[in-house]
């Protein structure tokens, strides 16, 4: 009884919310309702005992790749045994040519990494400019998530919500819906690859459309 009480008192509930719905005009990335997701997620977290001071939010221009990585690092440093951690990403998703990493090597059968588009990412490859350095790859996330998971131990919990996808069969009328994701993979056109896989709240081959005012997936989650 004493052990259980002590265990619960020492448990913290930590969260990181990343939402990018408005990108720089120069990127020509379509706006989406990601920022509206934040209020739903924060409300749900509050109902489950998360204190506002323990919920870190990165919205639009604040959600650069560097800022996201820094927040993940800080979250990893704060997390301890038995804690509960929730990480939510709501933004555009896109595939990008697989790159070899020390941890994973070449890990994608189709030759593409799944990636999120932070605020400072661009959707198209340029041989003289942007080459994908600000895309947030699954390989970028993996070491942070693995480290957090290890620190939480067997009694802790890590929940990761990934709300991004590519175009496909819509679940709503396209006249008032927009896709959450870039349908064209990010790659050097001199070495194209044709496979497309969703990084999404949907199945790998499902399209995901959101109503103009709010995200669909988080309304289901809540």
Each language-model region and where it sits:
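A short, charged/proline- and glycine-enriched loop
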Residues: 9-14, 215
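Caspase-like (clan CD) cysteine peptidase catalytic core
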Residues: 10-12, 67-90, 95-177
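Short glycine-rich His-centered loop
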Residues: 12-29
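Active-site-proximal C-terminal subdomain of hydrolase catalytic domains
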Residues: 19, 38-42, 59, 123, ...
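Glycine- and acidic-residue-enriched helix-capping/strand-helix junction motifs
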Residues: 24-39, 43
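Signal peptide-proximal N-terminal region
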Residues: 39-54
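Short beta->alpha junction loops
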Residues: 55-65
């Amino acid at each position: 009884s004493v052990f259980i009480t002590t265990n619960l008192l020492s448990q913290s509930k930590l969260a990181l919310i990343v939402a990018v719905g408005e990108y720089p005009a120069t990127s020509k990335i379509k706006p989406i309702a990601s920022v509206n997701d934040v209020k739903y997620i924060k409300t749900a977290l509050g109902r489950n005992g998360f204190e506002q001071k323990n919920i870190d939010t990165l919205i639009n221009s604040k959600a650069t790749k560097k800022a996201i990585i820094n927040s993940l690092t800080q979250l990893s440093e704060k997390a301890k045994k038995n804690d509960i951690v929730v990480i939510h990403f709501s933004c555009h998703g896109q595939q990008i040519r697989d790159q070899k990493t020390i941890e994973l090597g070449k890990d994608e059968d189709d030759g593409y990494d799944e990636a999120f588009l932070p605020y400072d990412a661009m959707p198209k490859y340029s041989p003289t400019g942007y080459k994908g350095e600000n895309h947030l790859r699954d390989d970028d996330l993996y070491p942070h998530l693995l480290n957090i998971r290890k620190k939480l131990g067997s009694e802790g919990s890590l929940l990761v919500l990934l709300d991004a996808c590519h175009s496909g069969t819509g679940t709503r009328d396209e006249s008032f819906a927009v896709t959450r994701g870039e349908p064209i993979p990010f790659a050097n056109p001199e070495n194209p690859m044709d496979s497309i896989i969703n990084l999404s709240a949907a199945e790998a081959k499902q399209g995901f459309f959101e109503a103009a005012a709010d995200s669909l997936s988080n309304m289901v989650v809540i």
